[in-house]
Swiss-Prot record:
Domain of life: Bacteria
Pfam families recorded: TLC (PF03219)
Major location category of this protein: membrane
Transmembrane segments: 23-43, 59-79, 90-110, 146-166, 183-203, 227-247, 293-313, 326-346, 361-381, 387-407, 446-466, 470-490
Topological type in the membrane: Multi-pass membrane protein
Keywords attached to this entry: ATP-binding, Cell membrane, Membrane, Nucleotide-binding, Transmembrane, Transmembrane helix, Transport
Gene coding for it: tlcC
Any GO CC annotation of this UniProt entry: plasma membrane
Protein name: ADP,ATP carrier protein 3
Length: 501
C-alpha cells in the first residue's frame, strides 16, 4: 500500500495534472473555454427548437447542405483574407463581436417582429401544393429568419470553438503541455454545458425550474417564445463579452511574460504570413497528413448527422412546440455536460497513459456501439414493443437516442477533439494556421453536409419520405463510414508518430 502522501500525489496527477506555475495561463484559458462552450450548448438547443417544431426534423439536412456549407466556404475565404492583413487578436475580436451583435438583433428585433418579415401561411401552402418536390426549400423561405439563426449557431461551433479557440491554444502549447492541458481544459469548459442546460430549463419552465408542467399556456405563443429567448440571448452575449475580455488579458498580460509558452510576438508575426486563398487550398490538398485530419472530421460529422436526424424527429413527436423542445434540450445539455466532465477525467488519463492511437480510436468505437443500438431499436421498435406491452415506445426511442448522443459526443469532446488538436502541433506554423482554417471550417461542415446531401436528395425525389421510411439506408451508410473512420485513424497515427520524432 502506498504512503498517504504518495497516494494523494498520484490522485492529483490523475485529476489535476496542471502545475502551480501554469495556473496563471490555465485559469483564464479554462474560463474562456467555459464561456464559449456555454454559448455552444445554448445555441445548439435554440437553433433546433426554432426549426424542428416549425419546419420538421427533415429540414435540418437542407439547412446544413444548402445554407451552412456555403456559409462556411464564404467565411473561410474571408478568414484567409483577414489573416493576411490583421493579426490573430484583432481577427478574434471582429469575428466574435459580429456573432454577438447578430444574436442581439435576432432576439430583440428580428424574432419579435417575425410576422412582418415572414410570408403568410396561405401563400406558402399554395407553393408547396404546386411544387411538392421543393417543399423543403419553400419551408426554409417561409421561416428565413430561423434559418439565418441556424447558420450563425452552427458557425459558432465551427468558427469560434474549432478555429479561433483551438488555433490560439495550438500556438501557445507544445505537444507535451497539450497532453496535460487539453483534456483538463475540456473538462472545465464542459461545465458550461451544464450551466447552459440549467439556464435553458429555467427560462423554458416559466417560474419553476424542475416541473415543466407548470409552464403557462401563454408561453405557447410567439410572444411567450420571445420572453424566453431574450434573456437567454442576453446571457449568451454577456458570456461572449467575458470570453473576449479573457482573451485580451491573456494576450496583454500573460503571454508577454510567461516562460512556459511561445513568445506572443513571434506567434503574431508568423500568423501574418502572406498566403492567397488558392495557395491555402493547394497547401491542404497537397498535404496527405492534413487530408487525413480532414477525413476524421468528415466521418464524425456525417455519422452524427445520420443519427441525429431520426432522433430529433422523435423528439418533435413528443415535444411539438418550441418551449417544450427547449426544455427537453436543456435537460439533455445538463446530462451531456455531466457526462462530458466525467469523460474528461477519464480521457485525460487515457491520453497520457495509453497514447494517441488508443485515444483516437475510442470515439469511433463508442459511436459505433451506441449508434447501432439506436438504429436497431428504431428498426425493430414494434417487435420490442411486443415484449414490453404498454411501455411508451416513443419516449424509450428518444431516451435511447439521447444516451447515444451523450456517450458519443462525450467521447468526442474528451478524446476526439484533444487528439485531433494534437495532430496539428507537429506541423509548420504556416500549414497549421492556413490548413486548419480550411479543414476546421469546411471539413467540419462538409461531413455534416455529405450526410445532409444523402438525406435531402431522398426527400427531394420522394416528398412523402420521412426518417422512419429511410432508416435502413441510413444504417448501411453508418456502417460503411464507421469502417472508413477507424481505418483512417490507424493510418494517421503512423504519420503522427513519424512527425513527432
Amino acid at each position: 500500500m502506498l504512503p498517504p502522501k504518495i497516494f494523494f500525489e498520484k490522485v492529483k496527477e490523475i485529476m489535476w495534472p496542471i502545475e502551480r506555475k501554469e495556473l496563471k495561463l490555465f485559469i483564464p484559458m479554462a474560463l474562456m473555454m467555459l464561456c464559449i462552450l456555454f454559448n455552444f450548448g445554448a445555441l445548439r438547443s435554440i437553433k433546433d427548437s426554432l426549426v424542428v417544431p416549425s419546419m420538421g426534423a427533415e429540414i435540418i439536412s437542407f439547412l446544413k447542405l444548402w445554407l451552412v456549407l456555403p456559409s462556411c466556404v464564404i467565411f473561410t475565404v474571408l478568414y484567409v483574407k483577414l489573416s493576411n492583413n490583421l493579426n490573430f487578436e484583432y481577427i478574434f475580436y471582429i469575428i466574435v463581436g459580429s456573432f454577438l451583435l447578430f444574436f442581439l438583433l435576432f432576439a430583440y428585433i428580428i424574432y419579435p417582429n417575425q410576422d412582418i418579415y415572414h410570408p403568410n401561411d396561405e401563400m406558402i401552402n399554395k407553393l408547396i401544393a404546386s411544387y411538392p418536390n421543393f417543399k423543403w426549400f419553400i419551408k426554409i423561405g417561409s421561416q428565413w429568419s430561423y434559418a439565418l439563426m441556424y447558420i450563425f449557431a452552427e458557425l459558432w461551433s465551427a468558427v469560434v470553438i474549432n478555429l479561433m479557440f483551438w488555433q490560439f491554444a495550438n500556438h501557445i502549447f507544445d505537444t507535451s503541455k497539450a497532453k496535460r492541458f487539453y483534456p483538463v481544459l475540456g473538462m472545465v469548459g464542459n461545465i458550461g454545458l451544464i450551466i447552459a442546460g440549467s439556464v435553458l430549463v429555467f427560462f423554458s419552465s416559466g417560474q419553476d425550474v424542475i416541473d415543466s408542467e407548470l409552464l403557462p399556456d401563454s408561453f405557447n405563443s410567439s410572444a411567450g417564445n420571445a420572453i424566453m429567448l431574450q434573456p437567454i440571448m442576453s446571457i449568451i452575449v454577456t458570456a461572449g463579452i467575458i470570453a473576449m475580455l479573457l482573451f485580451r488579458i491573456i494576450n496583454r498580460f500573460i503571454l508577454t511574460d510567461s516562460i512556459n509558452v511561445l513568445d506572443a510576438k513571434k506567434v503574431t508575426a508568423k500568423m501574418k504570413t502572406k498566403l492567397s486563398v488558392i495557395e491555402s487550398i493547394k497547401l491542404v490538398i497537397h498535404s496527405k497528413y492534413i487530408g487525413r485530419i480532414a477525413l476524421l472530421i468528415i466521418c464524425y460529422g456525417l455519422l452524427i448527422n445520420i443519427v441525429e436526424g431520426p432522433w430529433k424527429a422523435k423528439i418533435k413527436e413528443l415535444h411539438p412546440n418550441t418551449i417544450d423542445y427547449v426544455n427537453f434540450m436543456g435537460r439533455f445539455n445538463i446530462w451531456m455536460g455531466i457526462s462530458c466532465v466525467t469523460f474528461m477525467i477519464i480521457g485525460s488519463n487515457i491520453l497520457r497513459r495509453l497514447g494517441w492511437l488508443i485515444s483516437a480510436l475510442l470515439t469511433p468505437i463508442m459511436l459505433s456501439i451506441t449508434g447501432l443500438m439506436f438504429f436497431i431499436f428504431i428498426i425493430f421498435i414494434e417487435e420490442i414493443g411486443e415484449c414490453f406491452g404498454d411501455f411508451n415506445l416513443l419516449y424509450a426511442a428518444i431516451i435511447v437516442g439521447a444516451i447515444q448522443n451523450i456517450l458519443s459526443k462525450s467521447s468526442k469532446y474528451s478524446l476526439f477533439d484533444s487528439t485531433k488538436e494534437m495532430a496539428y502541433i507537429p506541423l509548420s506554423l504556416e500549414l497549421r494556421t492556413k490548413g486548419k482554417a480550411a479543414v476546421e471550417v469546411i471539413g467540419t461542415k462538409f461531413g455534416k453536409s455529405l450526410g445532409a446531401f444523402i438525406q435531402s436528395l431522398i426527400f427531394i425525389i420522394i416528398p412523402t419520405a420521412t426518417f422512419d421510411s429511410i432508416i435502413i439506408y441510413l444504417l448501411i451508410t453508418f456502417i460503411v463510414m464507421m469502417s472508413l473512420w477507424i481505418w483512417n485513424v490507424i493510418k494517421l497515427n503512423k504519420e503522427y508518430v513519424e512527425l513527432c520524432k
